[in-house]
Swiss-Prot record:
It comes from the Eukaryota. One of its GO terms (biological process) is cytoplasmic translational initiation. Component of the eukaryotic translation initiation factor 3 (eIF-3) complex, which is involved in protein synthesis of a specialized repertoire of mRNAs and, together with other initiation factors, stimulates binding of mRNA and methionyl-tRNAi to the 40S ribosome. The eIF-3 complex specifically targets and initiates translation of a subset of mRNAs involved in cell proliferation. Component of the eukaryotic translation initiation factor 3 (eIF-3) complex. The keyword Cytoplasm applies. GO terms for molecular function: RNA binding; translation initiation factor activity. WD repeats lie at residues 8-47, 50-89, 140-179, 182-221, 279-318. Belongs to the eIF-3 subunit I family. This is Eukaryotic translation initiation factor 3 subunit I.
Length: 321
């Protein structure tokens, strides 16, 4: 399995995301310029220039016409996906940590950091009215939001928090519907399964966990021996890929083995590790499965995005149960 190593960023990757068709791969890093690539051959199509700080979060809408990015420059930008021009800009009072398009593509969700005397807030904007003011503002009092996404049919939001809490929010009233505390440390990433019935979380407490979307019931746990930064569910097999590693400031040697920077594959049902993929020279910060399930990508602290296409033998891995 020889990966494509994409080097278009000067600093660490913060998030990567495929579009719905899987032909494009979007990446964000701390170097202010989100980038779009052809996922088939790794060719760089272009960059989205305009941010004045690290870009923490990105998302692309259903038909790949619009793209959003939020960053440490206290703003979220809505871009024309093809032309790379800014269509709209939302100014916030603190850094934008998470963002996402609704499935309908008409609303945008974002969350801001608790910093500089500002409290953490979840904001929802309507793309159709120039996004001048939010249609819903949800103050988050306890612990700041570190990961978030839309629930099925845009009925609610699911957010992961710095203290390990997982919450569900009603998008009409802004009320908190459910709150569970299954993680003991910060939730770094939440990714939905293709049919939105379940999602996987990645946490600093060295575990990734599977949850039911509607009830937030904890289903499975995937244990590692390092902080988990990202986890993604395969759309065609019962596999979950988990990535992380010791934080950069805690790594005292430069060996890729000592820091444990490989991506690990687990069986979704049995919670057993079934394989590892090495490669990154530093922790893995973001993972994404291709929508066809035949490849996956990882973005690391080393500034590289790596596209891994599975060998034909991957299809032969079967568990009888």
């Amino acid at each position: 399995m020889k990966p494509l190593a994409l080097h278009g960023h000067e600093r660490n990757i913060t998030q990567i995301k495929y579009n719905r068709m899987g032909d494009l791969l979007f990446s964000a890093a701390k170097d202010t310029r989100p980038t779009v690539w052809y996922s088939l051959n790794g060719e760089r199509l272009g960059t989205y220039n305009g941010h004045g700080g690290a870009v923490w979060c990105i998302d692309v809408n259903y038909d790949t016409t619009q793209f959003i990015s939020g960053g440490a420059d206290n703003c979220l930008r809505l871009w024309d996906c093809e032309k790379g021009v800014t269509l709209s800009k939302i100014e916030t009072k603190s850094a934008v940590r998470t963002c996402g398009f609704s499935y309908g593509g008409n609303e945008i969700m974002l969350s801001t950091d608790r910093q500089m005397g500002q409290s953490c807030r979840i904001l929802i904007f309507d793309v159709r009215d120039n996004m001048e003011s939010p249609i819903l503002t949800i103050p988050v009092d306890n612990s700041k939001v570190t990961a978030g996404l839309w629930g099925p049919l845009d009925q609610f939001l699911v957010t992961g928090h710095e203290n390990g809490e997982l919450c569900q929010w009603d998008v009409k009233s802004g009320n908190k519907l459910i709150s569970v505390q299954e993680h003991s440390k910060q939730i770094n990433d939440i990714q939905m399964y293709k049919d939105s019935t379940m999602f996987v979380t990645a946490s600093k407490d060295t575990t990734a966990k599977l949850f039911d979307t509607d009830s937030l019931r904890h289903l499975k746990t995937y244990k590692t021996d390092r902080p988990v930064n990202s986890a993604a569910l395969s759309p065609i097999k019962d596999h979950v890929v988990v990535g992380g590693g010791q934080e950069a400031m805690e790594v005292t040697t430069t060996s890729t083995r000592v820091g444990k920077f490989d991506a690990r594959f687990f069986h979704v049902v049995f919670e057993e590790e079934i394989g590892r993929v090495k490669g990154h020279f530093g922790p893995i910060n973001s993972l994404a499965f291709h929508p066809d399930g035949r490849s996956y990508s990882s973005g690391g602290e080393d500034g590289y995005v790596r596209i891994h296409s599975f060998d034909p033998s991957y299809d032969d891995i079967e568990f009888e149960y």
